[in-house]
Design a protein with these regions (language model features):
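N-terminal loops that bind phosphate or other acidic moieties
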Residues: 1-87
Length: 87
């Protein structure tokens, strides 16, 4: 059984394009606007690493891509992984 009620492990990097990135602002937005848990948002004004468990990874990607360039995107289905399948 999953430890989290959220199915998708969503990970990515956001690179600043025009405006400085603020990890606290990003953290607060994700926690308040996109249901999930196990959020990590760390970095500096140029680059932020996101790790978040959610059922709506597309919303995380949409928000993060509005802040800068996103890359190294990984979305894994933890439910499948729990059953020994590729996530």
């Amino acid at each position: 059984m999953l430890e989290s009620e959220y199915r998708y492990d969503t990970q990515l990097l956001i690179e600043r394009t025009d405006t400085d990135l603020d990890e606290d602002e990003i953290h607060d937005y994700l926690m308040n606007e996109i249901p999930g848990d196990c959020l990590i948002a760390v970095g500096d004004e140029d680059l932020i690493k996101i790790h978040y468990h959610t059922n709506t990874p597309w919303k995380v990607l949409e928000y993060c891509s509005s802040l800068g360039d996103i890359y190294d995107v990984v979305v894994e289905n933890m439910e499948r992984q729990e059953h020994g399948l590729k996530g």
